[in-house]
Amino acid sequence: MHASSLLSRRRLLGAAAAVTTVGLVTPAPAISYAPRSISLYNTHTGEWLRTVYWADGHYIREAVRDINWILRDHHTDEMRPMDAGVLDVLGMLREQLDTPEPFLVVSGYRSPATNMNMYLHGEGVAKHSYHIKGMAVDLRSERRSLEQVREAAMSLQCGGVGYYPRASFVHVDCGPIRHW
């Protein structure tokens, strides 16, 4: 798939994600209608989820709701609909790494208050983070090295990829293509 196709798809999916979770049943403009799945383990809450979140050309409302819960702000339990683009980045990353194991989630959605608190305490977060918009996830893998996760994410050319070896995670988002 060409980068321009992914960008167009991501923009359309981002527009669909602006709708509440209930609205996420619009067919995704994708070439393949193969089911998309992800597996997540929240390192802060101990909760895990393995689910098919897209099938037959539609996002599955209940699965997306469950993903939103797993990726909630663990400091406040606030939940926000995650951008469909970041769900697809996670799904493609899982396929690229060829592993059924769950991603170990360090951070998904962050409320503005949580993000500001982290920013003010010098925790290395961006003041206007994509996490606040539900467009980013910080993760790692048990069976794949951080370097493998970073390289796989960068090969997708689907958004931002940040490499944080000292904190033991890789940041992925569905914003502009960039890396650091």
Language model features with spans:
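Structured segments of extracytoplasmic/periplasmic soluble domains
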Residues: 70, 89-96, 100, 121-124, ...
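Cell wall/extracellular polymer interaction/catalysis modules
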Residues: 44-50
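N-terminal secretory signal peptides and thylakoid transit peptides that target proteins
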Residues: 1-20
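Sec/Tat signal peptide C-region and signal peptidase I cleavage site
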Residues: 26-30
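Acidic helix-start/capping segments at beta-turn-to-alpha-helix junctions
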Residues: 102-116
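Catalytic cores and adjacent binding grooves of peptidoglycan-active enzymes
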Residues: 31, 36-41, 52, 124-180
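Charged, often glycine-rich, active-site loop that binds/positions anionic groups
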Residues: 112-127
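Active-site acidic/histidine clusters and adjacent loop/turn architecture
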Residues: 56-106
